[in-house]
Amino acid sequence: MTEAIYAIPDIHGQDALLEDALHRIARDGGKDARIIFLGDLVDRGPNSRAVIDRLMMGQAQGRPWTVLRGNHDQMFVDFLDSGVIQSPHIRSGLSWLHHRLGGAATLASYGLDVSGDVTEWEAARRAVP
């Protein structure tokens, strides 16, 4: 018998939907089911921090989870690394902090209010593990 592999795409900070998906997978494939998270973990949704924390906890517990980085995750990393809010890959010219991209929502989940600017960059670096 072959092992089932589950894939979860584009969570976008939707922690309640992530928990629902994890419960469904556990019912179908067991608590140690292999899951691949296909990136775009953060932005737009209400609780990117809870999504990141949940995935880190699962991996720390030894769950067979593979987490890939999506373009929204990369924009988050770029901001944390150097305060960059403009990506050359975004054709619209919108900054990562624009509500359509969701960076401000991600930072809000860490208790930060950037109000459209990057003055909270150092605070963000301290707040995110």
Show where each model-derived region lies.
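N-terminal active-site segment of His-dependent metallophosphoesterases
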Residues: 1-54
